[in-house]
Amino acid sequence: MNSKNRINNVGEGVDIEIPDTAHQISSDSWFQAAFVLTTSINSAYVLGYSGTVMVPLGWIGGVVGLILATAISLYANTLVAKLHEFGGKRHIRYRDLAGFIYGRKAYCLTWVLQYVNLFMINCGFIILAGSALKAVYVLFRDDHAMKLPHFIAIAGLICAVFAIGIPHLSALGIWLAVSTILSLIYIVVAIVLSVKDGVKAPSRDYEIQGSPLSKLFTITGAAATLVFVFNTGMLPEIQATVKQPVVKNMMKALYFQFTVGVLPMFAVVFIGYWAYGSSTSPYLLNNVNGPLWVKALANISAILQSVISLHIFASPTYEYMDTKFGIKGNPLALKNLLFRIMARGGYIAVSTLLSALLPFLGDFMSLTGAVSTFPLTFILANHMYYKAKNNKLNTLQKLCHWLNVVFFSLMSVAAAIAALRLIALDSKNFHVFADL
């Protein structure tokens, strides 16, 4: 449904205004939204969390941190979901919601934060796809003729082709089922081969490595990665695709995401760390031993799943460009195809260039969590809910929301410093366009 500032009766005696958009909204079931959210949690990024979360935090910090991050993220996301129709208007974009509550400056600031967040996530997906593509190449031809930047460029091209072919988020349809199958392939392979290696291996070292100062920075950076694990930074955009009753249906999708949806991720993260300890790679499939064809299948699945996931996280950017330039009607019309080739192709080209320039995946996770996920998902969500529902909250609830705002603001600053330090160190150890 393409809508243009019209009023929609939701069957509860309330008229809800729907903003203009070139993309389809109000057409998906809560289950499809749940699959979009679950795809984000179980994307190929899960192959990195054993190395980027568990190694810096250890068993106690990693397990407790992931469980706490799950609970806190569920709470923060429910706050945003409940505000979707606040004030009699459907807020189909994160910036629309912030602007409605705070005003124009907050609208612009949220827009910048969100798009930086999504851009860095998408750079990470391109790095992931390129790394997996390189892993397949090395399995069969380890001659170093092709370097990581070459594989990142190929991955970017694949992402661009997919972006041109799928016009909007709701059009993913069957691709969400494909994404789930792909996720299961690399997760099952990683778990089975890790268990096989772990049973055979001698005792592992689970100590957190480094000096006290470096431990402090790596632990802080890992805390930012923890919040990156569970949060999309685009919940209103996903909720926009859901049928009425939109809040009730989105709550179902969130409960599915944070119960059933997190189980595969927990399994691969904990088993991977158990098998390899402090030597766990930021890309788990680089650690596992097994038949070449099995490892190749897992890596190819990770490549293709990253392409689908990138399209999900790039969809708010695509929606803005399509709406701004009035790209509506038949997606296969020549005008619309040419526009997607130019606009989306250009966006992915820039993302690919940055990914090849600085291919430090763990650092991207930490920096994204620090500068975007903390502010968007925790600071903004708590304060927006406090401001919107101020008259309905008791003193204790108000105090809790303010404590959350202050705590996560401090965490955001600390994590950003830690992430920038990691990037600076990696930049000294590796040149640009590094072959990691």
UniProtKB/Swiss-Prot annotation:
It is found in: Cell membrane. GO terms for molecular function: L-proline transmembrane transporter activity. Keywords: Amino-acid transport, Cell membrane, Membrane, Transmembrane, Transmembrane helix, Transport. The keyword Membrane applies. GO terms for cellular component: plasma membrane. Disruption phenotype: No visible phenotype under normal growth conditions. The chain crosses the membrane at residues 29-49, 52-72, 118-138, 151-171, 172-192, 216-236, 254-274, 296-316, 345-365, 366-386, 405-425. InterPro entries: AA_transpt_TM. GO terms for biological process: proline transport. The keyword Membrane applies. It is a multi-pass membrane protein. Expressed in epidermal cells of leaves, sepals and petals. It comes from the Eukaryota. Belongs to the amino acid/polyamine transporter 2 family. Amino acid/auxin permease (AAAP) (TC 2.A.18.3) subfamily. Proline transporter that mediates proline and glycine betaine transport. When expressed in a heterologous system (yeast), imports L-proline, glycine betaine and GABA across the plasma membrane. This is Proline transporter 3. It comes from Arabidopsis thaliana. The lineage of its organism: Eukaryota, Viridiplantae, Streptophyta, Embryophyta, Tracheophyta.
